[in-house]
Amino acid sequence: MVSGDVLKLECGALVVGIPAGGLTPTAEALDKASEGVVSRWIEAGDIHPCVGKVAVFRDFPGCKAERVVFVGLGKCKARDFQRVLKLGIDNAYLGKEVVLTTLEWLPDEVPEWIAEQSGFIACTALDRPKNYKTFDINWKKPKNIDLYVPDENKDVEKA
């Protein structure tokens, strides 16, 4: 688990949720640091809040992550969580260290449940075997997947 300023996290990929009708705290921080780029790209359709829509950007302004992976959350339903998270991780595959901001994705769910589900999906992604018939020979899976813990969820670190 990692904490601190999400904009200063040096990682291969930062997976950020985009709910319908608003922004998560991490998306807001990225929007502010980039002088409104996130909001403009949502309006332009480059980033879409529909469930399962993914947009990947390299060298995002104001962020130290190599890539920022925006994942559409729709109306933030628990039933979509695993599928959406898997899409985010699959699109962050080139990042050797991936940071998930999933504790912000479902504000009405218990943070411990979100952390447990995130861990399950992350372990599945790290353990999947390389199948060179299916994937390109240069395909690289993440070496490490961390859960970002915002300050208001510090008690989740203990769980």
Kindly label every feature range from the protein language model.
Residues M1-A159:
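Glycine-/small-residue-enriched capping loops at alpha/beta junctions
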